């Protein structure tokens, strides 16, 4: 088999493989699009189920909240009859409660009353008569206007007749100086000059001093000192470091017991708030946790379906 035949066969096989790869890519792309559309549809259905469940929980929570608020009011009325101590006054307001659920849509209003009839229209002209302009007599002439701008320059006139017998005129003034000429050739070298007179020998100023020489060798030791008396005392040395801290001292004697204090005044505590706000917070948090748990379960189901679909596609 020749090389040309082998190359042509390999090129044909390569083209078939590339064509098959393109077809498989197109199928995979279409499968991915269908999977994404199915996922969006399932997510929309799940969102609808979640909204319905949330609305049902909100409505149920509203009924429970109303019943608890009624019971709380009765309990508060019963507790208000207790005369346990001095009632508090000027107590600060508690924290604001959570926003309530949105109310139902109101009913449509009744149609308004009919308007009053309008005023009768005004009739327009039936026909139009053509009128001629009034002819006025001619008036007096107006004042003279401002002088106009000078006109443009006229053309040159014709040349005059030639002069007759005037003679030669006087000479004109001298003309300007001409430009410099080109440089001339170099001249011949001159003769050598006569020798000059001998000069007087000068004497310059002394130069600066040189650098100091190297240090010489040490000298011989000196003679021993006279007398056996000690020399004078030297200057005092620097202060030494601080010493170690000493041992702690013994404890003192206990003091005498103090006198009894006077009884304090009434604290005037504020009354406890109703339990409706606390229970409302707990119910809302519990419902939110349940809804978030349902969302997580639904997301896990969708992810599991995606994995199963991908495995089926790979096996196919």
Swiss-Prot record:
One of its GO terms (cellular component) is collagen trimer. Residues 1-34 form the signal peptide. Residues 78-269, 281-316 are annotated as: Disordered. The keyword ATP-binding does not apply. Residues 94-126, 139-198, 204-263 are annotated as: Triple-helical region. Residues 209-221 have a biased composition (Pro residues). Collagen polypeptide chains are complexed within the cuticle by disulfide bonds and other types of covalent cross-links. This is Cuticle collagen 7. It comes from Caenorhabditis elegans.
């Amino acid at each position: 088999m020749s090389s040309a035949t082998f190359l042509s066969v390999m090129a044909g096989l390569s083209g078939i493989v590339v064509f098959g790869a393109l077809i498989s890519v197109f199928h995979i792309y279409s499968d991915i699009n269908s999977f994404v559309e199915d996922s969006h549809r399932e997510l929309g259905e799940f969102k609808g189920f979640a909204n319905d469940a949330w609305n049902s929980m909100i409505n149920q929570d509203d009924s429970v909240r109303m019943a608890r608020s009624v019971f709380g009011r009765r309990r508060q009325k019963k507790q208000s009859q207790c005369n346990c101590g001095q009632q508090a006054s000027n107590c600060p307001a508690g924290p604001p409660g959570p926003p309530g659920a949105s109310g139902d849509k109101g009913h449509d209003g009744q149609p308004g009353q009919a308007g009053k009839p309008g005023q009768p229209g005004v009739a327009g002209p039936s026909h139009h008569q053509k009128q001629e302009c009034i002819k006025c007599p001619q008036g007096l002439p107006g004042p003279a206007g401002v002088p106009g701008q000078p006109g443009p320059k006229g053309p040159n006139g014709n040349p005059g007749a030639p002069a007759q017998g005037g003679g030669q005129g006087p000479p004109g003034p001298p003309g300007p100086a001409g430009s410099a000429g080109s440089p001339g050739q170099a001249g011949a070298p001159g003769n050598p000059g006569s020798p000059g007179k001998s000069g007087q020998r000068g004497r310059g100023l002394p130069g600066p001093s040189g650098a100091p020489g190297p240090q010489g060798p040490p000298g011989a030791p000196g003679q021993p000192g006279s007398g056996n008396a000690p020399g004078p005392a030297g200057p005092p040395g620097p202060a030494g470091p601080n010493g170690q801290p000493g041992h702690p001292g013994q404890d003192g004697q206990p003091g005498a017991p103090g006198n009894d204090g006077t009884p304090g005044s009434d604290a005037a505590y504020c009354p406890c708030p109703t339990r409706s706000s606390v229970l409302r917070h707990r119910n809302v948090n519990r419902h939110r946790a349940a809804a978030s748990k349902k969302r997580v379960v639904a997301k896990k189901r969708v992810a599991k379906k995606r994995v199963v679909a991908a495995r089926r596609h790979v096996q196919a």
